[in-house]
Amino acid sequence: MRIEPIIQGVVARSAHPFGCEAAIKKQIAFVKNAPQISQGPKRVLILGASSGFGLAARIALTFGGAQADTIGVSFERGPSEKGTGSAGWYNNVFFKREAEKEGRIAINIVGDAFASETRTQVIEAIETYFEGEVDLVIYSLATGMRPISNQPGEFWRSVIKPFGQTVTGASFDLEHDRWIDTTLESATEEEALHTIKVMGGEDWESWIDTLINAESIAQGCQTIAFSYVGPEITHPIYLDGTLGRAKIDLHQTSHSLNLKLANFDGAAYATVCKALVTKASVFIPALSPYLLALYRVMKDEKCHEGCIEQMQRLFATKLYGQDHISVDGERLVRMDDWELAPHIQNKVNQILEEMDANNFQVIGDYQGFKNEFLQLNGFGFDEVDYSQDIDLQTILKLTP
């Protein structure tokens, strides 16, 4: 069978196994040749390890100098007679294969990170493979809903909406390469609460509490979670909306976790990352034109970073091997420093003032945006022969 990219709006319905393998190998090659992580963690738990920042962090810590062993938790779908499965499934498979080639432990736990059974599996894996303790916990779950405790079948569901105003902005239909104007109504307080429950810090704190109670926290253990703030032009839909409320809750959680981990001479940080094309970010209306302009400017200025560049720089220059960890006035680790540089933002704003439905593919980096989206699912790599037939039985044997 031949696997073609199937896109519906901004959702990819297919994944190419060997394109995902190419993506893993490309990221490994980058971190091996980048400035290396020194004094890094050796036993790392990643919650949300199969794509985006979670996967990039796992690759950076394993191959970028720290030589870490990892346990990765993710909720992915394997191949079947009905479909190819998810990209994250293959990312898990090929990451593990490459890590084990270099003698590293790479445990994949495929399950619901909100479920108590998954936590039990994680604790058992830490006991079995990590001598009972972890040195770093990365919280990188990206999901639209979370089960409500003690209410089977009921969920909190996040929404992407502004507050106190309607916001009109553009998103892209990647299937047909179209600009779509979207108007978002103001969120209700209940919608805000649900979004905080799904995307705020409560589950992160619950995981750390579970690990503390299981005596799985090593001396000096740190934990990080990822956030976004963005420039003022993105604030109506992001920082001042439901997503922003959830991220502020995440930031506050980092402070309470920092106090808890102080008992282990450890620390907790919310890490503010750069705006990037991820499976999650393409769903945010009004952010897409900004991404097109930002990609164009940062590539022109030769300071563009993807997830893997961000994570290698985070661990090599911010979190490890330093006399002290550099944070801002709110105790946030800022990986959006290059993005928010005034000369970058001035040029981005100039492009956005001119961008519309007729010229977005010309003045913005639409091809870069779309290709990065395709590469999340294993497509768009020159070294992969996409005309080659793939035997279903072969990929059914690929297990993480």
From Swiss-Prot:
Which keywords has UniProt assigned to this entry?
A: Fatty acid biosynthesis, Fatty acid metabolism, Lipid biosynthesis, Lipid metabolism, NAD, Oxidoreductase
The record's annotation in PANTHER family points to:
ENOYL-[ACYL-CARRIER-PROTEIN] REDUCTASE [NADH]
Write out the catalysed reaction. Answer: a 2,3-saturated acyl-[ACP] + NAD(+) = a (2E)-enoyl-[ACP] + NADH + H(+)
Biological process GO terms, please?
fatty acid biosynthetic process
User: Annotated pathway, please?
Assistant: Lipid metabolism; fatty acid biosynthesis
Supply the enzyme class, top level. oxidoreductase
- The residues annotated as site (Plays an important role in discriminating NADH against NADPH) are E76
Q: What is the recorded name of this protein?
A: Enoyl-[acyl-carrier-protein] reductase [NADH] 2
Q: What does this protein do?
A: Involved in the final reduction of the elongation cycle of fatty acid synthesis (FAS II). Catalyzes the reduction of a carbon-carbon double bond in an enoyl moiety that is covalently linked to an acyl carrier protein (ACP).
Organism lineage reads as: Bacteria, Pseudomonadati, Pseudomonadota, Gammaproteobacteria, Vibrionales
Could you say which protein family the record assigns here? Belongs to the TER reductase family.
